[in-house]
Amino acid sequence: MIVKNESAIIRDTLENIIAHVPLDYYVISDTGSDDNTADIIKQFFDEKGIPGEIHHDEWVNFAHNRNCALQHAQGKTDYVLIFDADDRFEGNFVLPEELTSDRYYLRMANSVTGANVYFRTLMFRNDGSFYWRGVLHEFVEQRKKTVVEQKIFGDYYVISGRFGARSKNPQKYFQDAQVLEKAFYSPEDEDLKDRYAFYTAQSYRDADMYEKAIEWYAKRANLGGWYEEVYYSLLQIALLKIELNAPLDEVQNLLLAAYEYRPQRAESLYHLARQLRLHDKIKLAYIYANAAVSIPLTKDILFVDHSVYEWKAKDELAVSAYWVGNYQLCHDLCVELLFNPAVPEQNKKRFLDNLMLAKKHL
């Protein structure tokens, strides 16, 4: 772990970690705190009887400083767990009884609802085989030609938090975009240009600079490469165009282009059905909602909106089914949605109301 000025949350973070993962040793690098973060860390682990060490390293960039922490830890345990101060385990995380793989991916989500689920490397062998790359949105690279990898599934998420010290900076996303854009145009890390373009777009989006985000998502899509990033870039262009009140025809073409690029993903069709319904194109909405519902949960790992596959596409289909006169389908879907544990409670009154409306026609 690397930390800076996390005194407000670090104890809760550490409590959360040890409640889910047994720790034998800790290594944490402080990158320039001017509060008592390091003291809180030491006091916490002393109370728990867990040995370890805290280092103080000058800040350079994320990959550099994570590598510093990794070098401090090398050889002191069999595996290392990587964790950010504002991340949290939610649910029932079960560590495999026997650790045999070189690298482990854990389920990440941006909220407890499970929307935008993806997998990230959070644990790997502590034998010098792995290192970090990237000035921002850094990732784990391997030195060995082949490694054994494993995804840890289960009823849990690691929630990627936004309440640490860095997130309190109102200019965070704009500044991140500037750093990533500079890295994109730098002659270094030529093989990371597609990644830098993608996260430049993400950062401009999160800074609410939608036109710039669209420009960079388009740049990322045109670079080709990893199909999941290309698909997500195409989808985001369409969704940002919706935010900018682009004409329906333009939005429809963009969402269909995303679907055509990756037809095993349902998100683009769900959003298309919703936009068509909102523009009173009910018959078309019904067709595309039907198509979205027919797509099973994807095996993709990047920013998958599980809620679309679990209930949102069915919700959209139920509404359009009612308006095209397929009252039985609307009725059946509403019953299913009412008993679907993935549906947030605040939506169920609407499903019950829709169910009653459909019943009147049966």
Residue spans for each PLM region:
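Short, well-formed alpha-helical segments that are part of the catalytic scaffolds
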Residues: 5-21, 25
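Conserved donor nucleotide-binding strand/loop of the catalytic core
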Residues: 39-72
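"A position-specific structural signal for the A-helix of alpha-solenoid helical repeats
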Residues: 199, 236, 271-274, 278, ...
